[in-house]
Amino acid sequence: VLKKCLPLLLLCTAPVFAKPVLTVYTYDSFAADWGPGPKIKKAFEADCNCELELVALEDGVSLLNRLRMEGKNSKADVVLGLDNNLLDAASKTGLFAKSGVAADAINVPGGWNNDTFVPFDYGYFAFVYDKNKLKNPPQSLKELVESDQNWRVIYQDPRTSTPGLGLLLWMQKVYGDDAPQAWQKLAKKTVTVTKGWSEAYGLFLKGESDLVLSYTTSPAYHILEEKKDNYAAANFSEGHYLQVEVAARTAASKQPELAQKFLQFMVSPAFQNAIPTGNWMYPVANVTLPAGFEKLTKPATTLEFTPAEVAAQRQAWISEWQRAVSR
């Protein structure tokens, strides 16, 4: 009888020993095998006595869209991959809780003052090109848009992608009320508009375009991983739009303490050291940058709207973009 009962007893007691699961919504390139996700998962699990589950979506704006849809029933404990341009919209959902992370642990351009969203990296949007193929890259956003050069361009959709939203705001900074006409001109050079960064960059690497919307730090991947220095970010005279990527814990999380622990871990060297050569962005903590980063384009001017300005205008600017590119 005991032999028969023993397996049943083990089955009944197994869940007692199950590790708690922390569910993190993020974007696909973060969670990918070649992204920082696997390294970060391993480091956090070694410390937390838990299981870290990364749920990958296409891009940062998709994360917010998904969370809005799921509301308080979301399985997400942490959302990682929103950015400075989505702060106001994300705050207004009421779905996030205060982080408990001290602002002095964070070093980003312009400083940081937000008790809910915690930066984990930052970078500057840029158009990346292959120096072997494109000998005369544009020197400004205006040249990219207005030149009669037949450059083929790929960028991301501002409704689903944070780089896409970044370009929308960059255009707005440079062109203001003339942005719709600029979008119409750029549409003539646009090969496609993708839902997320990974798809766009993949198409560019296959030779589908001359320029792709990415980051000033993207060439570091090719320099360090592939030992190739033929990829570069075009340095635009008007300046480059800043992106600060953030994470936050959800108010409805079933694992609030673990979620807070993860946000604290996020600004530690164990996480931050995985950023330069995993996410190919700048870290927010004082960690040593790998060789190769000194070769990267450094924007002379940083462009940025406040989160409140973005929240007030984002929908109108997206509608303008839609009308302009569909003509």
What kind of region is each of these model predictions?
Residues 292-327:
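Extracellular/periplasmic bilobal clamshell ligand-binding domains
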Residues 38-54:
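Short alpha-helix C-terminal cap/hinge motif
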Residues 250-306:
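Mature extracytoplasmic/periplasmic domains
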